[in-house]
């Protein structure tokens, strides 16, 4: 009999951002404010603050001591004062942060925020803090009543920054703000569906723009046998072709002439992409990549570095996530294939504990394969595969999802089931259902840009690594290779071609993982980046989700391995930090449709439990948090009704 495994840790591939909590420990307005539903967008300008107190009292004491020293030393010490920044919070959830301005009691930010919100709140809080090496100190806060926000009037002016005693934190201390709330019902962008047609410009406020004239191939699972799925007719009586994902990836890698760039949560060299006896294609991914590198193709692998797997002086630890990252690196060690193991890192200036949390709990979860392909006329173009399938063990599956009958054939050396300690006799394999796609066209170059930004960041040497060879020159310089056409030259599908796709790339990543974001945080807004504490954030995938849900007219369909969010509105554990708006937006969408007496359906498909031991502490914790998403604290009978429907769907 197979045995249950011991409890093991889990790794979340999502972003840690939009997860901050900011509870103001004192009242910022006299009396109690009315709780309102603030659902729409907040357009905010945090302009400047004046006459802030000096919170660096230690440095102030040093300054007093050094004032008796020569003029130059005295002048330097007296310049040390508060390093202020502002957090914006609603219902206890941080929805925005300014950048830090060092050594200023009169900081000028002039920073703009356009934030989607779906919160029950009494006040919008602006909390002014002093950034310190060991954390931050509260200077004071400004509270704007939610009822005043929802009046529709623009709020603009200077507001006293209050301390815990209800008085200004310093005489004359004030914060200059401009706030305009727009309810979701008044936003034209959501009234005509998700968007299509020649006038559609994509999701606004994102890092990558909409790219027109591409071609997309969709895949269900790693492989689809002929005839195993129903025939589907598309518009214009076009026959839909079910794709063969891993076979197409194998062929694309085999036909590459210049580059093969791969990212993954896990990339395992022993995995076989093609099975069922395809002639000449029965080789492992590792052997295939070595062959291509020997042909002169630049092969780069960017793989998440599991902090629990290590290889040092011949001693190896497999790692609790079983990603085989060290084994894959060792396999390619003496080849021309370059492998970078990339850990998740905390932001500059984050505390030691925060950095440990980020490195342990979160992972890099992108899965991309980028190759050059034939573009005709002796030219090459960029093609990218992207989606949910890692090139590792346990991922090869078909829509039939067999549990036992393939254990001696296509899954003979690939029986992975982390529900059990060892896949002994009678142990079924774990089926794996996921989606993937191939992008051919201008958007593929954005996926290439993502890889280059990540590679340049991950390859930057630190500490003793500076003595080793640099990886900076590993990326191909396309301006020196005229054979590879650029994004401006790539041919586009005609607008009226039924196979034409307009594609926009979204992601969740920050400046600790990419190189290329602005050095000056003041430039973040122009690149549609959010500002965290000492970090810039691309949260475009969250922006896209919100836009799609708000614009949906008839239904929402979601498949995901996890479903966590809107913890600021849970009935308990509000401080868990899963502050994305997705569950709340779905609940409000259904409530609005009920009020309008319009039919609407939300289909949310998640596993019975995510990968791992169902009785293990990490899995039970995730299941507990997921249940909280279905019992969001309702306010109003119609919301209670729609949330009850969601609970019914879940169970």
Where are these predicted regions, by residue range?
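Short secondary-structure subsegments characteristic of cysteine-rich extracellular domains
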Residues: 279-291, 574-588
